[in-house]
């Protein structure tokens, strides 16, 4: 099974990706984790990405596509995966579809963890990620509305979007997702 996790900042994408990985025995491909590791290790791509991440901006599409392509060709993803933090725009979704077609790995579902903006802010402020400061959170929420809403429409039109209420306790959200897959 190949899943894309979608949602605003603080919606639980990383948490639910981990839970689903345990339940479904699939690797999690976390763009946030890949970016943080590349920045921490000062890889050439990480050095290019760092200023965008620090501002809370989305990385340019060619840079994101390069990150994801490098990861999807690794051998642990052959039987399926959970992709968290990518795509973030409709253009990236189309590019991902082309890449997956080339790799023979079609996407099964895009899971949207739905919460409101106030909950996004509250949850983000209670995390301990290096880029979770008020200015970056506000920027990311703005980018979510600008870019991710059209992405949801893209997957809805392809009839592979599952919207899940992400307000309940973590384990309950996991159960809601598993019941829908």
From Swiss-Prot:
GO biological process: one example: AMP salvage
Keyword vocabulary terms for this entry: ATP-binding, Cytoplasm, Kinase, Nucleotide biosynthesis, Nucleotide-binding, Transferase
**What broad class describes the main subcellular location of this protein?**
cytoplasm
One family from Pfam that matches here is ADK
Catalytic activity field: AMP + ATP = 2 ADP
Residues annotated to bind ATP: 10-15, 127, 168
List of residues binding AMP? 36, 57-59, 85-88, 92, 140
**Its job:** Catalyzes the reversible transfer of the terminal phosphate group between ATP and AMP. Plays an important role in cellular energy homeostasis and in adenine nucleotide metabolism.
Tell me its family.
Belongs to the adenylate kinase family.
| HAMAP family for this protein | Adenylate_kinase_Adk
UniProt note: domains: Consists of three domains, a large central CORE domain and two small peripheral domains, NMPbind and LID, which undergo movements during catalysis. The LID domain closes over the site of phosphoryl transfer upon ATP binding. Assembling and dissambling the active center during each catalytic cycle provides an effective means to prevent ATP hydrolysis.
Q: What is this protein called?
A: Adenylate kinase 2
């Amino acid at each position: 099974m190949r899943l894309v996790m979608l949602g605003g900042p603080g919606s639980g994408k990383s948490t639910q990706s981990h839970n689903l990985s345990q339940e479904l025995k699939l690797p999690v491909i976390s763009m946030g984790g890949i970016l943080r590791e590349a920045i921490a290790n000062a890889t050439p791509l990480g050095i290019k990405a760092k200023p965008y991440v620090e501002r809370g901006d989305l990385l340019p599409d060619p840079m994101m596509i390069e990150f994801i392509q490098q990861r999807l060709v690794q051998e642990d993803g052959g039987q399926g995966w959970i992709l968290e933090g990518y795509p973030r725009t409709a253009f990236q979704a189309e590019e991902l579809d082309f890449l997956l077609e080339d790799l023979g790995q079609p996407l099964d579902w895009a899971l949207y963890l739905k919460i409101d903006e106030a909950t996004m802010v509250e949850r983000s402020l209670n995390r301990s990620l290096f880029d979770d400061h008020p200015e970056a959170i506000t920027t990311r929420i703005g980018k979510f509305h600008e870019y991710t809403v059209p992405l949801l429409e893209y997957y809805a039109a392809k009839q592979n979007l599952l919207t899940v209420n992400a307000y309940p306790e973590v384990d309950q959200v996991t159960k809601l997702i598993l019941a829908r897959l």
